[in-house]
Amino acid sequence: MRGGCAIYGDARVLNQSEILAVQGLTHEHAQILQIYDRATVNHSRIVHQVQLYGNATITHAFIEHRAEVFDFALIEGNKDNNVWICDCAKVYGHARVIAGTEEDAIPTLRYSSQVAEHALIEGNCVLKHHVLVGGHAEVRGGPILLDDRVLIEGQACIQGEILIEYQVEISGRATVIAFDGNTIHLRGPKVINGEDRITRTPLVGSL
């Protein structure tokens, strides 16, 4: 454990987890790294000005910059792949972010992406600018890339090799599934909802 940080309450840092607090690398110059309430950190590396609190559970993860994990969120990497959360990304509610065991099955949350409520992110998934996955939505890579104002909620299911970008909303029970060998590209503005089922890249103007 190095640098100025605050670990208090019933928080636990276990199993060779590494805490490296560094201030001044983000816009919040004075913010210090904090782990508190009942947050638990296992086999993980927590760096810079991260905030972990509530009942969050973090295992085999690399979390850095000003990222936050709180409420009952579960971050679960494994010995083969960790979970990477950085920049200003947030995971909260009862959301789960889980690494797979196959090669590159590393969930990556960057920039302002958020995973909330009861959402699940699993495997090779990258979330970037202004992405929110909430409700009971499931996103299983992949690889999957979500970028530039993407909202996935309800009971939506996204699975396979998929790129979704620029003002796309997916909700209800909608599914976007790329089967073996296929890649789906959805570029907005688009709204996909109800029972919509997409298994290939739509023709221009068909959605």
Predicted features along the sequence, with ranges:
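Residues at the loop-to-beta-strand transition
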Residues: 5, 11, 17, 23, ...
